[in-house]
Amino acid sequence: MGKQQETILIIGAGIAGLTTSRLLTNNGIPNIVFEASTPDRSQGFAISLQEFGYSALLAALGDLPLSSLIRGVAPDRKIGGSGWIDQALRDNRTGEVLVAPDLTTTKQTIVRANRNALRHWIVDCGEDELDVRYGHKLQRIEGKLGDVTAVFENNAKYKGSLIIAADGVNSTARSQILPNVVPEAIPLIHYHGEFQISHSAFDELIRPHSGHSNILVGVGDRFNTPLSICNITKSQVHLDWSYSRTVKGENDILYCPNVPSEEAKQIPPALLEELDTLSLAEPWKTFLNSESLKAHRVFHWTTRCVYITQDDARHAGEQGVVFVGDSWHAMPIFGGEGGNHALLDGVELANAIITSTESSGRGSWDNVAKNYYGGAWKRSQDAVRRSTQRFFLLHRPATEWKEISEKKKTLA
């Protein structure tokens, strides 16, 4: 039983949970990952990995080269691509480039990554298999730091020394341990669509506008329409789009922050009507219209943020729970840094555990939480605020985008 209680229990098999598990496993520290969903769950949209996130992960995995990550996760990896993006913002009503970095002097520091591929790549970065148990939805947590029990809805119970809450923005662990911490809904409309086209159609309809970039970002008058590659092969291209805008008054029919999960998969007629009035340029015009959406999988996304105080983090640690990922620093997807901070969380928490274990032969769990939060708390909470501000700036009026574009031209 003593050995079992030294096991670390990780709730959630997302990026943060798997990163932590992989690094602990590589260092011989027993851990189990519990995931509520089934192994075939799909979350195949792409995210932007920044240098501060992936460099820490590559170093922790034994100084792996960036090329290893790119070959494993880039949306265009199967056709020899590198996950490159041009970082340009285009007027989605004319196609004109409004803002773009000088790519002749800028090295690639951002890598687009397919989320499913990233999870698989992390899992495969070690000789020993990770112990991931699917179909385990957390019900409650019992005990205290050093001797804690996770109870699941399937009646399974597991004892461990520490629980790592990697169960996302709607974290069950957080809602029990810190019921006062409630995700904050941002007043924005956000719809996400997924679809597939043939590679030849992609070359005809999108490639002339995007070039080799894995994302084509369109900005309008307080609304955005990014079009992104999720996965590309020689025959098929899986893409997604987002339509996001600020809320229009108190009675905005499309603003439904508490919509039930099943209803969130339905396309409201008001969205179709709105898209048809946007006067979009190509290629957005071809895909974001009422007729095209009939063949797409469309989801309503509520953008939420999570803030946790240092006292909250300390209190949770005393009860045997440490947070990683969106469970304690959820931030906007478009313009956010969430995936990168999830990687850093996993790296920094694993390092705190490994260091503690090496110095004492077993985990000094008080020091683990203290050392981890010593750097991670400010880093991640600052990122939530920064990302939220950036999210609103990316939904600015068209007149402001024009002013920014003209100023850039003047300085060029």
Swiss-Prot record:
Glycans are attached at N92, N170, N231. The keyword Signal applies. Coiled coil: none annotated. Pfam families: FAD_binding_3. Gene3D superfamilies: FAD/NAD(P)-binding domain. It is an enzyme of class 1 (oxidoreductase). Keywords: FAD, Flavoprotein, Glycoprotein, Monooxygenase, Oxidoreductase, Signal. It comes from the Eukaryota. Its cofactor is FAD. Pathway: Secondary metabolite biosynthesis. Its EC number is 1.-.-.-. Residues 1-21 form the signal peptide. SUPFAM superfamilies: FAD/NAD(P)-binding domain. GO terms for molecular function: FAD binding; monooxygenase activity. FAD binds at E35, A46, R119, D326, G339. Transmembrane segments: none annotated. PANTHER family: FAD-DEPENDENT MONOOXYGENASE APTC, MONOOXYGENASE, FAD-BINDING. FAD-dependent monooxygenase; part of the gene cluster that mediates the biosynthesis of neosartoricin B, a prenylated anthracenone that probably exhibits T-cell antiproliferative activity, suggestive of a physiological role as an immunosuppressive agent. The non-reducing polyketide synthase nscA probably synthesizes and cyclizes the decaketide backbone. The hydrolase nscB then mediates the product release through hydrolysis followed by spontaneous decarboxylation. The prenyltransferase nscD catalyzes the addition of the dimethylallyl group to the aromatic C5. Belongs to the paxM FAD-dependent monooxygenase family. This is FAD-dependent monooxygenase nscC. The gene is nscC.
